[in-house]
């Protein structure tokens, strides 16, 4: 997890300069190779051209830094249908969306919530859960959250 944070910290100023948001970073081994996956977004949406451009820019910064000592594959992508929600900004942006939230500890004997994201205020998320109705969850209690696509 520390490596992911190092990657985010290195690339955050570059992303800001390029007017994009880093939505999520993953760094893991796949079929014996290290893979750095970086999900990006911007207000007007991400194109293939954006991904190509950011791949070149991020790749150069990662190669110049000493963060990734082993060889790696760099993948740049849009967040997709099941976009991860990690920041307060992302929760606020997707108020009204169907959301899946998993918590570190049970809230009302429940750790998994699915429903409409109603609000984010004072470090608390309010969701209209399909099972228990309106539930408030501390931002710090969220293990994982993502948009749930209606397909």
Swiss-Prot record:
It comes from the Bacteria. Its main location: cytoplasm. GO terms for cellular component: cytosol. GO terms for biological process: ribosomal small subunit assembly; translation. CDD domains: YlxS_C. It is found in: Cytoplasm. Keywords: Cytoplasm, Ribosome biogenesis. PANTHER family: RIBOSOME MATURATION FACTOR RIMP. Belongs to the RimP family. HAMAP family: RimP. Required for maturation of 30S ribosomal subunits. This is Ribosome maturation factor RimP. The gene is rimP.
């Amino acid at each position: 997890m520390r490596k992911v944070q190092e990657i985010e910290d290195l690339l955050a100023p570059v992303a800001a300069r390029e007017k994009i948001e880093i939505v999520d970073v993953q760094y893991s081994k796949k079929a014996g190779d290290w893979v750095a996956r970086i999900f990006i977004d911007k207000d007007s949406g991400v194109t293939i051209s954006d991904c190509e451009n950011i791949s070149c820019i991020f790749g150069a910064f990662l190669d110049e830094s000493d963060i990734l000592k082993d060889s790696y594959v760099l993948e740049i992508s849009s967040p997709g249908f099941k976009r991860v929600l990690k920041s307060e900004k992302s929760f606020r942006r997707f108020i009204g969306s169907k959301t899946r939230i998993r918590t570190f500890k049970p809230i009302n004997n429940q750790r998994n919530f699915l429903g409409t994201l109603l609000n984010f205020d004072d470090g608390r998320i309010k969701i209209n859960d399909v099972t228990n109705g309106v539930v408030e969850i501390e931002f710090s209690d969220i293990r994982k959250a993502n948009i749930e696509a209606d397909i």
